[in-house]
């Protein structure tokens, strides 16, 4: 019985038929008429306003150790629904479309959390309504083993990120305290103490031990990496000889250029952003780096490319939302704000191919990639179209998407607020805080930095059939049932507050 939705305990029904709803209508028609009627009625009621869904395969659900992972999520998230699939996660498209929960957690064993699954989840979560954007906050929750995955699922205390460690340059002025070891300049690092300005320091020529110590002793809340990587290692230096982080069977170790070994053992809950690394999100077996980060380094949420990265929009752009707008977004929200930015760029600059889903390793698809007039005016090329298509579905998000990890409040270049301005009417106000510098790129390290649209998520889903911009249309806002997106204002950005007002209703 593929694609089952588990209804809340206590729902009545003959022979427990009302406890599940199947997406397989052929199977459904085989049920006695009375249970079918009751089944559909209770399913509709149960799915009216869902907040959280756990998606899991029948095989994983049948494994007691992994079922405890799913059960832990159900226990933590009130009213959570369980959707089960048999042969492919794509089977869950119909029940998710019927429910459209705010959060969807795909519980998967490492053997299931493949590159194919990541791509399938990206695509199916854009198909839940008529707009081209991702419709839910989703994450794939896995671990080196069920015990590791359970620890991730049980993490409930929100994480306020105060301490950051990085193997690449960051905007440290936006964080409370942190250290960056430069992957481009040997011997160069920057450190920020709480309450002080960032200061340049001399770093060791080989930073392997320093980075392991930053994890083991420094216990950062956020760890960031870039540079060359495979599923088995991270090459610390990008432009100069340096050591490695390597993984095997869930264990992580640093290995410097002299062959010295430094085991990683860092168990404080943290989030990890390998924003510029190839393959760090590709789980291809028990020795995968992603699993070692979860098992040996305390990672509760992370993103990661499942293929070699060459464009970078979907990775590096998360810094623009998460680190450079401190406190505004959770890590989940920052990931999906950047995803919305990418989809918007495709829809605006390359509308003829924006919804193509079969994409090659160099961003090729069945149709020729032609920039729109808007793209030509913005200096966007055919290569950008291929890069955006490639990046769209090749970055995984691992962890419970409802778990909140956000930076401690810090400097912001603009303020954005969403307020009720009347019955079923809302106003987004954007107030520049840095004058003419308010919307300039903060940090240029990496690839495809800056120029991101303003994204404001709504506290709850709105009725997509009752959305209308009533003022501020000159800013070309995009209004969906879960967020409003305002394109980056560019050089013509106002230096005083500006407003966008829209009508919207909550689902009845």
Predicted segments, located by residue:
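Cysteine-dependent hydrolase recognition
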Residues: 49-508
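N-terminal signal peptide c-region/cleavage motif recognized by signal peptidases
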Residues: 41-45
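Residue-identity detector for glycine
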Residues: 3, 10-13
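Sec-dependent signal peptide recognition
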Residues: 30-39
